[in-house]
Amino acid sequence: MPGKLNDRVAIVTAGGAGIGAATARRFAAEGAAVVVADLSGTRAQAVTEEINSAGGRAAFIKIDAADPEAIQATIKLAIDSYGRLDVMFNNAGMAVVSPIHDTTLESWNRVMAVTLTSTFLGIKYSVPIMRKQGGGAIINTASISGMHGDYGMASYNAAKAGVINLTRAAALENAKHKIRVNCVCPGGINTRVAQVLGGDRAEEFRRTMGAAHPVGRMGEPEEIANTVTFLASDEASFITGAKIVVDGGVSAHTGMPPFLSSKA
């Protein structure tokens, strides 16, 4: 039985771990050829070898997703290797924990570059190819942190909010060219980012973050990959300009203390 992405070609940035790696594997399982791009060539190669060993098709490239030449090289690799580009998953991002008054301009600019500029570049350079081919799908990783504020993460909040509105603008510009552009907004996901944010209290961070979700746990990378795969497929043919929230119910909450929860 053909997969949802049979014979399509996809690029996944930050594809060497977490959501990116899970999505690269899922894309390949659904029949796509995948270019895995990551700042860590070692991680990108490992995911690629795993896909190829399982009978899929994948290539890898070491890139800084905030570098325009690197994004162009990634797209060139996809076309040279597989002949086309059908799906662009702009997944690169980073967070720095710092209150605004302590955030350096260098730190601010780097978060913007890796999180927002990389998404802009992925759209900018994939759109001409997709227009020439007659269509495609672009999915961007935003976050519930782009919908709400967090303590000490202003640069990340601003960058992810930018990803959401960039998604909308790109969707409007490209709808008539049969290019769908959507973003996914994860809640707390069990990736190595949780380790980084939690530092030496990573396990406590995971427990606290999990308890903050109405479903009682953090999400898994594969659960985001499921949504991204849907958005990349023809099953989402009438969806563009959307932000799809996958957060275990966190954003459904007003912030009111759960004093009435026993009556629910």
Would you name each region that the model predicts?
Residues S143:
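Residue(s) in the substrate-gating loop at a strand-loop-helix junction
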Residues C183, E203-E235, I239, V246-G248:
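C-terminal helical subdomain
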Residues F89, A175, R180, I239-G241:
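Short, small/polar-rich loop/turn modules that mediate ligand/substrate recognition or access, typified
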Residues P128, L172-K176, S237:
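Alpha-helical segment proximal to the catalytic Tyr-Lys
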Residues P99-I100, S107-M112, F205, M209:
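Substrate-binding pocket helix/loop in short-chain dehydrogenase/reductase
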Residues S98-H101, H148-A154, K176-H177, G216, ...:
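Active-site loop immediately N-terminal to the catalytic Tyr-X3-Lys motif
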Residues I123, A159, T167:
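Active-site helix of classical SDR
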